[in-house]
Amino acid sequence: MSKYDSHLKCSFCGKSQEQVRKLIAGPGVYICDECVDLCNEILDEELFDTASSMPAASRAPVAERKRSQSAPLSLNQIPKPRDIKSYLDEHVIGQDEAKKVLSVAVYNHYKRLSISQASADSVAELDDAIELQKSNILLIGPTGCGKTLLAQTLAQMLDVPFAVADATTLTEAGYVGEDVENILLRLLQVADLDVEEAQRGIIYIDEIDKVARKSENPSITRDVSGEGVQQALLKMLEGTVANVPPQGGRKHPYQDCIQIDTTNILFICGGAFVGLDKIIEQRTGKKAMGFIQDGELRAKEQRTADMLRDLEAEDLVKFGMIPEFTGRIPVMSVIDALDEDVLCQILTEPRNALVKQYQKLLRMDRVELEFQPDAIRAIAQEAYRRRTGARALRAIVEEIMLDVMYELPSQSRKELTQCLITRSMVEQRSTAELLVHPSAISTPESA
């Protein structure tokens, strides 16, 4: 060993070559085996923190998926479309057509995965000359009709990674905003950074109509948040090997990328597509004549829904989606607007119904919350008038319950046992009242 070699030391901890077992040389720097072990511990801790910060619905299935990953899925283990729809029915009211479309798509997605994981003998039995290609889905419907809720409910029951992304933050590569590869990064995080597991997943892209081309005619200026995003999504939707930066590409430009094959990743896109019915009217010539009165609002919505069922790919192109993008999403489903009857059901029937949520909140303070049937109807009518779908329901109930939830924790729990919501409270925007249940009033004999 030369005199120079005897003075080599780790660039991180400063220990000499004689004090460590191994000294690894780099371009102008050295690192010892002890520092390498320390780096591995730090990385393992960061990965654990990342998994712990994920939502419980996304984090819980990870260990179970890892246990079942090595074994191919059999047809008996794949959830049937009826089972998937039944689960959706417990959480989402109405939208039967969209539920059927999603149930069939998820079922076929599982079957593709079962074939890709099967052994060579099994594949031969299934006729490996036929390759099953995926059919991406487009959900079209007004705001607050349940597009995102359908996707979130699917994520709770599926045995594959499921990620939800927002298209409004995406921009073309090189511009301020998120790259399209960040969509795959979310899926990778849900899969606990397991590439093989992420390649089996499903991605829901919300607000996809916001990346529509700003003008039907090409402009001399670049549309970096519209057509540019659609162009960047093309190969990802069809199936390609994408380079995904594990820490995001903008703030850490020199990191090593992870390669993910999107061939078996199912993409579900959703958007409101405001004004699309007008484009269909111009093409079909079924335009309604005359003025719409307030009493005819429901009939107008029905005509709009019927018009959207005549949707063709050329209408989406007219709206601003490029032909290459629409061609990669062959399955299109229209989600109906919510009427008063459906809004009443949404308030009371689902497993996580809004009324049940507030009843549970007040029950924790030993107060029984009761909504009279005509109050439920009044809340649904007001939500229908606001034209924001089911999102208006929570806003209205919050207005009514605000003062009660503010005063209740400070009141004596022995005196307050009931909270009643009436129709007049909803119509007059008055706050709910806390009542003493008759059974809680002490009689002279008991006193």
UniProtKB/Swiss-Prot annotation:
A GO molecular function held by the record: zinc ion binding
CDD domains named in the record: RecA-like_ClpX
CC terms in the record's Gene Ontology section: HslUV protease complex
Superkingdom classification of source: Bacteria
A Pfam family recorded for this sequence: AAA_2
Keywords: ATP-binding, Chaperone, Metal-binding, Nucleotide-binding, Zinc
PROSITE patterns with a match to the protein in the record: CLPX_ZB
Residues binding Zn(2+), per UniProt: 10, 13, 32, 35
Residue stretches making up the ClpX-type ZB domain: 1-51
GO biological process: one example: proteolysis involved in protein catabolic process
Binding residues for ATP: 142-149
Protein role: ATP-dependent specificity component of the Clp protease. It directs the protease to specific substrates. Can perform chaperone functions in the absence of ClpP.
Family under the similarity heading: Belongs to the ClpX chaperone family.
Subunit structure: Component of the ClpX-ClpP complex. Forms a hexameric ring that, in the presence of ATP, binds to fourteen ClpP subunits assembled into a disk-like structure with a central cavity, resembling the structure of eukaryotic proteasomes.
Record's protein name: ATP-dependent Clp protease ATP-binding subunit ClpX
Species annotation: Acaryochloris marina (strain MBIC 11017)
Gene: clpX
